[in-house]
A protein has these predicted regions:
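Active-site and donor-binding regions of nucleotide-sugar-utilizing enzymes
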Residues: 7-138, 142, 316-319
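Short, hydrophobic beta-strand segments that form beta-sheet elements in well-ordered domains
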Residues: 8, 89-91, 111-113, 265-272, ...
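A nucleotide-sugar donor-handling region in carbohydrate enzymes
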Residues: 114-117, 121-190, 195, 199, ...
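Conserved catalytic-core segment of nucleotide-activated headgroup transferases in glycan assembly
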Residues: 238-275
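Catalytic binding pocket for nucleotide-activated donors in carbohydrate/polymer assembly enzymes
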Residues: 317-361
Length: 361
């Protein structure tokens, strides 16, 4: 097997960044396959494909059609440029039918998985179980997909994760650190470097006086007094809201975001790539970078600035909570969508990391 290359399959910019790190850790050559749905194809996806492909032997960027029948007819294109056999296949979105198609059509000696996002942390999510949809099961048989989600989980000999210490889709887990090294040497401004969890803090509106938005008037602060004497105190604060289209209706998502902007007096908005609506009341941040990389660049450019990041259940916020001069706040609205077991699990992880959770009415 020594002469065989490895294959790594990505579906998102974050997965491409993880792929870059995984390839850099190994001497063996890699082929890279990045799959992108047509409606998600944008500069951000293309940028991270270029970043990851620089470390590969061969790279393919394949657009997945929106039309169901075009997708079916185009399945063989997913194999274009790939070898018939690989030493190790690496995949994150093992529930995705396109990823499953490729993994069922090639041969590999070993399989390793890595994080799809926070879905890995939710037992019972689509990354843990086979689809129960009868049409999907029929299509899998027609496509020759024998290995599905549960079978791929069992095959995975290890799982590479951004969230060590948390249960995941396969064991053992191996920590994958994307940003700690990049954050070293950043001006700290009253805090240490990339920090560990500083304890659980959950704010509930019934515990203290609330303002007209139904939330706590006083937000929690990290304890920086002990370090202020040795590090310069930031003179400016930027508040950023991370967009997330979590509600089924675009208008409801926009209204929720605008309410959060107003309630927390947030001046900037970083949209999610899947957003199809426009939010008013804040300056849009337009960047080819994912939020984690954008924030690192901002920390370098603005050594006198402190950043407050507000979000609902964002993977990006989980990834930046330990950045210097950065405070992350998780907001939990009263809507039922934010109290399902899966979402509750993500809020639980955030609390374990020491991210303050603010309940609003």
């Amino acid at each position: 097997m020594a002469d065989l290359a490895n294959l790594i399959i990505c579906l998102t910019p974050l997965q491409a960044l993880m792929a870059q790190r995984l390839m850099a850790q190994r001497e063996q050559p890699f082929d890279l396959l990045m799959l992108c749905y047509e409606d998600a194809d944008n500069a951000k996806f293309r940028h991270y494909f270029q970043v990851a492909s620089a470390g590969s032997r061969h790279a393919e960027y394949v657009l997945i059609p929106q039309s169901k029948w075009r997708r079916e007819l185009g399945l063989p294109r997913l194999l274009r440029g790939l070898d018939k056999e690989y030493a190790t296949a690496f995949a994150a979105s093992i529930d995705n039918p396109n990823v499953q198609y490729v993994l069922n059509r090639i041969r590999f000696a070993a399989l390793e998985t890595f994080d799809d996002g926070t879905g890995n942390l939710i037992p019972g999510s689509v990354l843990y179980r086979n689809s129960s949809n009868r049409q999907r099961q029929l299509m899998n048989r027609l496509r020759g997909i024998r290995l599905q989600t549960e079978g791929l989980r069992r095959l995975s000999r290890r799982h590479h994760t951004l969230y060590p210490g948390q249960p995941n889709i396969a064991a053992p887990t191996v920590p994958l650190d994307l940003w700690a090294a990049a954050g070293q040497g950043l001006p700290e401004g009253g805090q240490g470097g990339l920090r560990q969890s500083e304890g659980r803090e959950v704010l509930r509106s019934e515990n203290v006086a609330v303002n007209e938005c139904g939330l706590n008037e006083r937000l929690p602060e990290k304890n920086m007094a002990s370090m202020a004497a040795t590090n310069p105190v930031p003179t400016r604060t930027r508040r950023i809201l991370l967009g997330q289209p979590l509600l089924p209706n675009a208008a409801d998502n926009a209204a929720l975001a605008e309410n959060l902007l107003r309630c927390f007096k947030i001046g900037e908005y970083f949209p999610h790539p899947r957003e199809t609506y426009r939010v008013s009341g804040a300056e849009y941040i337009t960047s080819p970078l994912i939020f984690e990389d954008h924030l690192l660049e901002s920390l370098r450019r603005e050594p006198d600035t402190r950043f407050e990041v507000y979000h609902l259940v964002s993977t990006a916020a989980l990834n930046v909570y330990a950045f210097p001069r950065t405070t992350v706040y998780a907001v939990r609205p009263a809507e039922a969508a934010f109290h399902t077991p899966g979402v509750a699990r993500i809020y639980e992880v955030m609390a374990q990391l020491g991210i303050p959770i603010i309940d609003i009415e």
